[in-house]
Amino acid sequence: MTAIAPVITIDGPSGAGKGTLCKAMAEALQWHLLDSGAIYRVLALAALHHHVDVTSEDALVPLASHLDVRFVSTNGNLEVILEGEDVSGEIRTQEVANAASQVAAFPRVREALLRRQRAFRDAPGLIADGRDMGTVVFPDAPVKIFLDASSEERAHRRMLQLQEKGFSVNFERLLAEIKERDDRDRNRAVAPLVPAADALVLDSTRLSIEQVIEKALQYARQKLALA
């Protein structure tokens, strides 16, 4: 009997540093990577490429079931590969974002994408980045980490990111948006943003990203008995 590949789930709110941590862990362990937050955007882009109606659940389900997507982390950069093509930039357009919100509203599409996400589980292992990876998608994962940070710290990090890109931002507005999103995510009826009962809750508020990576890798290696 073939042993099932291990999964490390990294859940947490927006701006906690999940993406950076997941890329670093995938590279350190040489494991596969799943960015669940990008899945709906990738499906939306595939629908646009193949002229599939994003308002038709019946048309979207088969596309979701056979979505040809890979995530590759190289030197800290995440490449999103759809049907052999790097679409990392294309999935960030407003057109794709709008289409993604439409496709995400269909229950059967969500179910098809849930199965598709579980199919990423492959040897030697998978790092799964999301909001309900440890509670819904991979409830049997041997290592679960919930990465958190104060709303103020996450707003500060987001402000710096936007300023580096040349945007003028208002800290108070950013903070209000983050608090509103937190409240929505934590109180929604389906798959609320909460740590799994068996997850390590790692608060990154006062930690550097290097310290977060070190703590997460140390915990994962202990749990999995990796060298």
Swiss-Prot record:
<dbReference type="GO" id="GO:0006220">
    <property type="term" value="P:pyrimidine nucleotide metabolic process"/>
</dbReference>
<dbReference type="GO" id="GO:0036431">
    <property type="term" value="F:dCMP kinase activity"/>
</dbReference>
<protein>
    <recommendedName>
        <fullName>Cytidylate kinase</fullName>
        <ecNumber>2.7.4.25</ecNumber>
    </recommendedName>
</protein>
<keyword id="KW-0067">ATP-binding</keyword>
<dbReference type="GO" id="GO:0005524">
    <property type="term" value="F:ATP binding"/>
</dbReference>
<keyword id="KW-0418">Kinase</keyword>
<dbReference type="GO" id="GO:0005829">
    <property type="term" value="C:cytosol"/>
</dbReference>
<comment type="similarity">
    <text>Belongs to the cytidylate kinase family. Type 1 subfamily.</text>
</comment>
<dbReference type="InterPro" id="IPR027417">
    <property type="entry name" value="P-loop_NTPase"/>
</dbReference>
<feature type="binding site">
    <location>
        <begin position="12"/>
        <end position="20"/>
    </location>
    <ligand>
        <name>ATP</name>
    </ligand>
</feature>
<dbReference type="GO" id="GO:0036430">
    <property type="term" value="F:CMP kinase activity"/>
</dbReference>
<dbReference type="InterPro" id="IPR011994">
    <property type="entry name" value="Cytidylate_kinase_dom"/>
</dbReference>
<keyword id="KW-0808">Transferase</keyword>
<dbReference type="InterPro" id="IPR003136">
    <property type="entry name" value="Cytidylate_kin"/>
</dbReference>
<dbReference type="GO" id="GO:0015949">
    <property type="term" value="P:nucleobase-containing small molecule interconversion"/>
</dbReference>
<keyword id="KW-0547">Nucleotide-binding</keyword>
<keyword id="KW-0963">Cytoplasm</keyword>
<dbReference type="Pfam" id="PF02224">
    <property type="entry name" value="Cytidylate_kin"/>
</dbReference>
